[in-house]
Regions:
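A residue-level marker of the well-folded mature domains of exported/periplasmic proteins
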Residues: 2-5, 14, 18, 22-333
C-alpha cells in the first residue's frame, strides 16, 4: 500500500462520510462526463444535481503536480454533482492574467472561487471585489502571508521549510557546510515562507552557511543550467535546497555531473523524476503536500458554506518526508 499522511487520510474519510450522508440513496450509475472548455476543464458527476458552480483558478498547469490539484477539484465536483471549472494562466505565475480570470468568474456569476494567492499584495482588490459581490473566496496551495481573512487549504509553508532544513543540515550534512536555495519564483509568498523556514533551521547549526538564492524558473531544462552556473560560481557548496516542484532539476544536475554523494539535494513534491533522484542518491529528501487534497477540499468547503452555512476553514494538508528509506513505497504525484 502506498503511504500517505495518516491524519490527512482520516480527515478525507470523515469528509467523504459526511457528504455521503447528504447524498441520494439511489444506486450508483449513469453517465459521468468531463467536458473540456476554453477556460479549462468542466467536471460534473452523478451525485444529486445542484445549480451551484465554482471556479478553481490556479497559477499554473504546467506540471504533474498542478494536474493533481486539478484532478482533486474535478473529483469533488463529480462527488457533489456540481459544476467545477478549473483554469490557469497560459504562462505560469502571470498575475495580470490570473486576476483577469478571477474578474471574469465574478462577472460570470460563479458561486465561489478557489485560487492560488501567491503574491503578497496582488490579489487583495479582486478578492474584495468578489466578497462585495457575495462570492466567497478560499486560497489553496499558496497564501498571501498576510492576515487578510482568506482561509487557506495547503501545507504549513514555513514549517515545511524548517523540516527540510533541519533534516538536511543535521542528518545529511552533519551540521556543517554551505548551501544554495533554488526557487522557481523568488517573489512567491509561499516559497518565501519555505526559504524562511530553511534559514530558521540553519540558525541551529553554527557551521552551516547560506551562500545564495537562485531563480531556476519554471522550465526544468533552464533550471538545470541555472544550478550548474551556481555550482561553477561556488564549487565549494555542499547542497542545493529547492522550495518548489521544480526541485527535480537539482537531482538532474547532480546525477548528470556524477556528483552523487558529493553534493546533496532536497526539495518539494513527489514527481516521478524527483522520486527517481531520491532512489539514485542524487537527492536525499523531498517533501510532499497532497496536491489532490489541495484541489478537493476547497470545493468541498465552498459547497458546505453555500449549502449549509458553515464557515470556511484553514486546512493543513500535511508534510510527508520522503527519503531513501521509504521512497520505494511512495506513489508519484
Amino acid at each position: 500500500m502506498k503511504k500517505r499522511v495518516v491524519s490527512i487520510l482520516v480527515c478525507m474519510v470523515m469528509a467523504l462520510g459526511l457528504f455521503a450522508g447528504c447524498s441520494s440513496s439511489e444506486p450508483a450509475g449513469g453517465n459521468e462526463t468531463t467536458e473540456t472548455t476554453a477556460a479549462g476543464t468542466q467536471a460534473q458527476g452523478t451525485a444529486p444535481a445542484s445549480d451551484l458552480k465554482y471556479a478553481v483558478v490556479l497559477h499554473a498547469l504546467n506540471s504533474s503536480f498542478y494536474a493533481k490539484m486539478q484532478q482533486g477539484a474535478e473529483e469533488a465536483g463529480k462527488a457533489l454533482g456540481i459544476k467545477v471549472d478549473v483554469m490557469a494562466p497560459t504562462t505560469a505565475n502571470n498575475l495580470a492574467e490570473q486576476i483577469s480570470m478571477i474578474e471574469t468568474c465574478i462577472s460570470s456569476g460563479y458561486d465561489g472561487i478557489a485560487t492560488v494567492v501567491w503574491d503578497p499584495d496582488g490579489f487583495a482588490d479582486v478578492i474584495k471585489k468578489a466578497n462585495d459581490a457575495g462570492i466567497p473566496v478560499i486560497s489553496l496551495n499558496q497564501k498571501s502571508g498576510k492576515d487578510d481573512g482568506v482561509m487557506f487549504v495547503g501545507q504549513d509553508l514555513e514549517e515545511s521549510g524548517y523540516m527540510l532544513g533541519k533534516y538536511m543540515f543535521g542528518q545529511v550534512m552533519g551540521g556543517k557546510g554551505k548551501y544554495i536555495i533554488a526557487s522557481c519564483a523568488p517573489a512567491d509568498s509561499a516559497l518565501i515562507a519555505r526559504e524562511q523556514g530553511i534559514k530558521r533551521a540553519a540558525k541551529e547549526f553554527p557551521e552551516i552557511e547560506f551562500v545564495d538564492l537562485v531563480d531556476i524558473t519554471t522550465d526544468l531544462t533552464t533550471a538545470v543550467g541555472v544550478i550548474e552556473n551556481a555550482y561553477l560560481a561556488h564549487p565549494d557548496v555542499n547542497a542545493f535546497l529547492g522550495v518548489d516542484v521544480f526541485s527535480e532539476s537539482i537531482g538532474t544536475f547532480i546525477e548528470s555531473n556524477k556528483l552523487n554523494g558529493k553534493v546533496y539535494g532536497a526539495g518539494f513534491d513527489l514527481t516521478e523524476g524527483t522520486l527517481k533522484h531520491i532512489s539514485n542518491n542524487a537527492m536525499q529528501l523531498t517533501i510532499g503536500q497532497n496536491p489532490f487534497l489541495q484541489g478537493y477540499y476547497p470545493v468541498m468547503q465552498l459547497f458546505t458554506h453555500d449549502k449549509f452555512g458553515y464557515d470556511l476553514l484553514n486546512m493543513n494538508t500535511g508534510a510527508f518526508l520522503v527519503t531513501k528509506d521509504n521512497v520505494s513505497e511512495v506513489k508519484p504525484e
